[in-house]
Regions:
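Bacterial N-terminal signal peptides that target proteins for export
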Residues: 1-7
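Bacterial N-terminal signal peptides
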Residues: 7-19
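Formylglycine-dependent sulfatase
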Residues: 25, 29-419, 424, 433-451, ...
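Functionally engaged cysteine thiol sites
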Residues: 83-84, 459-464
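Short amphipathic alpha-helical coiled-coil/interface segments
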Residues: 449-456, 460
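Juxtamembrane/start-of-transmembrane alpha-helix segments at the extracytoplasmic/lumenal side
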Residues: 466-480
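Alpha-helical transmembrane segments
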Residues: 482-496
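Cytoplasmic C-terminal tails of single-pass
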Residues: 497-504
Length: 504
């Protein structure tokens, strides 16, 4: 707990985030020139697995062919930092409290809890798009894949039975095909082949989702990339193997410091992630080439993102799910030449979320869709200066890892977390970007803490299952505070929903 006094003094100068319109005024804002009578655009959505937001520098093809002619959102986030719920949110535009996929195990998790009868695929398919998925769908899909099940809305279906870079099985339009670990078997290359064939074989508008297993562990690189990044320096931010975790919640305090061998494993995995992204980078280029050769590229909206980030040892953690920056932040790049966006635009300070992707794509395609929790990004991309969110909810349900159920609210300046244990975290991201100082227990921070608690009460409704079971009072880790946050909604009063399929 270092520099708390300085953080507290600066924090009292600003209790709420700045007007987002002010952020936009300082951004490099793209302007759209798309005609309402233009042909519907093709849509390409590329979703990687466990890719951090700060890795795009290692993807030169993407930088040259997506970021340079397109728009980058440096402040893009997911609203539940875990593969299964995040992918459900990408396909529906909804929070976990709406689609009810909170984690990767049932109940409230896995494929059988996902209602796939209304998704981005069905919206576009019903509007005349030819749709295809290539890669990872929803965790737990393997139980349905072996029966030949193909979700509604997909015309071409080349999906992992279980996601892996080698030694995997794909279900191709309901038929199973196994792959080994030979030079032509790497999943990134196989999926790119299938995606390119889909572009070549399509007439009319298309929707293509390419969902790679990379750079998820085991991040096995494509053939020829095994020796790349040999000189990659270890990442050692101040939060790496955090020395003083006395102000962190119990789940962090119980994590032991890393051994030398663990640090070496973290560094090796990080290098493998970068190596595996080289194959993804080439896949991006191949899909763009196919679109260009087919005369489609100019009127194609290309979206590149990841399902969540991952921590490389920050706060002694090496996975995702945590409400910390490395876990919740993701890359987000878009290109649509026909829209006339200013090439190389960046929109810093615009809090773009994974729940915004489905309504953005539907808006671009001009197709009707049900109401969503997310909002279309197109008005921002077209230069409008209307109101935009100043903060957003993050929600997560305890699963296979020791992180308790939590709700959090993240703004441009603050991250506030409240766990089902009653523990709280509050970070001033301006003064403390590495989230080293939990100031929830600092008396001078009480006005900020109370304001953030009130905001969380507004956003975290309904609460995640089990959130209200363990504690009905808020107890900051460093200081007991009276009048803490109390969420009064009961499990019985929340909206209930049965899984679409029997588990297993």
């Amino acid at each position: 707990m270092r520099h708390v006094a300085a953080i507290a003094l600066g924090a009292l100068l600003l209790l709420v985030p700045a007007d987002p319109a002010a952020w936009a005024s300082t951004a490099t804002a793209p302007v759209s020139a798309v005609s309402e009578t233009a042909a519907p655009p093709d849509i390409v959505l590329i979703v990687t697995d466990d890719q951090r937001w700060d890795t795009l520098w290692a993807m030169p093809i993407l930088s040259e062919r997506l970021a340079d002619p397109g728009v980058t959102f440096p402040d893009a986030f997911v609203v539940n930092p875990l593969c299964c719920p995040s992918r459900a949110s990408i396909l529906t535009g909804d929070y976990s409290h709406t689609h009810l996929v909170y984690r990767q195990i049932p109940p409230f998790g896995r494929f059988e809890w996902f209602h796939d009868d209304s998704t981005l695929a069905t919206w576009l398919h019903d509007a005349g798009y030819r749709t295809g998925l290539f890669g990872k769908y929803i965790d737990g899909y393997q139980h349905a894949a072996v029966t030949g099940y193909v979700p509604p809305g997909w015309d071409r279906w080349v999906a992992f039975v279980h996601s892996a870079p080698v030694d995997y099985t794909l279900t191709i339009d309901g038929s199973l095909r196994g792959f080994g670990h030979g030079p032509t078997d790497h999943a990134t290359e196989v999926l790119a082949d299938e995606a390119v064939a889909f572009v070549k074989g399509s007439t009319g508008p298309l929707f293509l989702e390419l969902a790679t297993s990379a750079p998820h562990e085991p991040a096995i690189p494509s053939p020829g990339d095994e020796d790349a990044f040999a000189d990659l320096s270890p990442a050692r931010p101040p939060s790496f193997d955090e020395a003083d975790v006395s102000d962190k919640p119990a789940w962090v305090r119980e994590l032991p410091p890393f051994t030398a061998s663990q640090e070496a494993a973290i560094d090796a995995f990080r290098a493998d992630q970068y190596r595996s992204l080289l194959g993804v980078d080439r896949a991006v280029g191949r899909v763009l080439d196919a679109l260009e050769n087919a005369g489609r590229l100019e009127n194609t909206l290309v979206v590149f993102t990841s399902d969540n980030g991952i921590l490389h040892g920050e706060h002694r953690w090496t996975k995702k799910e945590a409400p910390y920056e490395g876990s919740i932040r993701v890359p987000l790049v878009m290109r649509w030449d026909a829209a006339g966006w200013t090439p190389g635009s960046r929109l810093p300070g615009v809090l773009a979320l994974n729940i915004d992707l489905a309504p953005t794509i539907a808006d671009a395609a001009g197709v009707p869709h049900p109401p969503t929790d997310g909002r279309s990004l197109l008005p921002l991309l077209e230069g409008e200066r209307g109101s935009w969110r100043s903060d957003f909810l993050i929600e997560h349900m305890e699963g296979t890892n020791p992180i308790p159920t939590y709700c959090a609210v993240r703004s441009e300046r603050w991250t506030y977390v409240r766990y089902s244990t009653g523990e709280e975290e509050l970070y001033d991201l301006v003064a403390d970007p590495f989230e080293l100082e939990n100031v929830a227990g600092v008396p001078a921070m009480m006005p900020v803490l109370e304001e953030r608690r009130a905001r969380l009460r507004e956003l975290c409704s309904p609460v995640p299952p089990g959130f209200e079971d363990r504690s009905r009072t808020s107890v900051p880790i460093a200081l007991a505070v009276l009048g803490g946050l109390v969420l009064v909604e009961s499990v019985a009063s929340r909206r209930t929903r049965r899984p679409r399929r029997a588990p297993g």
